[in-house]
Amino acid sequence: MEKKSIQEDFRNYLAQSQREKDFCYFSGKMETISVNHPRSIWNQKANAKLISANEDVNRGFVFSGRFETANQAAQISYEASQKIHNALKWLIHKQGIPIGDKILIAWGVDGSNQEDMFGSTDVFLGKDEDEGEKEAVADTQVEFAQRLKKAIYGKEQDLGHNEKIAFLVLEAATTGRLSVSYYQEYGFIQYAQLMKTVERWHFAHSWKYDWYDARKGVWKSRIMAPSIFDIAEFAEGVERDVKGGKVKGDGKKKKIESNEKILGNTIVRLLPCVLEGRAVPEDISRKLLAKACHPLCYSEANWNKLLKITCSVIRTKYKEVGSMEINKDSIDIPYNYGRWLACAHEIERRALRSASEKRETNAMRLFTKYAEHPNKYMAIVQSKIQVYETKLGQKAYWLQNEKYRISQQLNQNPLEKLVAARHLDGRMILGFEAQMETFQKKEEKEAAAGGEANERIEEQN
């Protein structure tokens, strides 16, 4: 109670000591108007202000349009300004989601304890009846914001909430100005559509992802949509070495680095794809596809992740061949060219592994050229893997048969189309990835069968 009394006394003191009152655009009341609004809303951009005017400094040099003074554009009372900025600062600290050089805030704006923003502090912050005189806790839907963060970053589909929700993205356009680069509000009716839209994103862009659990020492996999952060990072970034770092099976650890501002801009462009159901911008899809066709520019782990992200993004564009399962009946030219290259890669990979050699396969070395001129480089790749087919012997028969069946699918197309094929699109990547996933499943079954056989032998002994 003493704390509240001090706050009231301070507000009364300010009201008496400050200048004459005017109409506040926020509260709709005659109150003392604020001239200098707070800064340091966001720690990373400490000097940036959301509301500011420097007319006295640049008078005569800045075109102000129909306004002669800053107050004609908008005038906000001191109390409203303090409440707005402190609430925003608190929201950023409590449930902000960093996206590059920007910050995303999601919060509930229509809870029962937020009926009057300019009422008492208890009404504004929301008081927990069970806590009596304890510090008030605002109902800004923290749990929802956390679930949204997981949804946006590709980890969860069900947000499970029924309140009115707002989304806000802030960025510092300059060192002194903070701007709103994205804002969207969902009421009770729109919320149900929002949930369907987010779920649709996760369903439409899901793919199988593999990662290594260093703590348990095992590989894990899960079908999920990629995070928009990963999409933006791989679309805009380049691979760099991590000093002193190592990753299993790859020697030096590699990471993807990108310009913070470009990364943030791309993530903001992807937000409507998750929240509003828009298609992924075509230029982002093209960047991912172009980079996926350069496997030698990445470590094996990063390229595999890039490949899966690319498939997740482009699969909605090529629905006939966009499944994670192989479409064996398809005679699509780019799709089957991709499948054929996967077979060539697998044959050489198995031969190199049996000989304890570790180097890139010819399929990987010629991947980029193959995508540009598939008919020409198909013959070149075939000539280079013949020796490995011979080395594998009977072990390569099923792979050779698969490669032969794919060739038969290709031959159902007119010869002139096969010869004229150039610069294969995303269907090649989808075909390659689907075929490699089939090989991985078969390899896992073989490993499991081998382990069971060894266990039976040990039991017999």
Residue ranges: model-predicted function:
Residues 27-29:
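Short Cys/His-rich metal-coordination motifs, predominantly Zn2+-binding knuckles/fingers
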Residues 1-8, 31-461:
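Extended alpha-helical scaffolding segments
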Residues 16-22:
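Short metal-coordination and nucleic-acid-contact micro-motifs, chiefly zinc-binding Cys/His arrays
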Residues 11-15:
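Short amphipathic alpha-helical segments and helix-helix/interface helices
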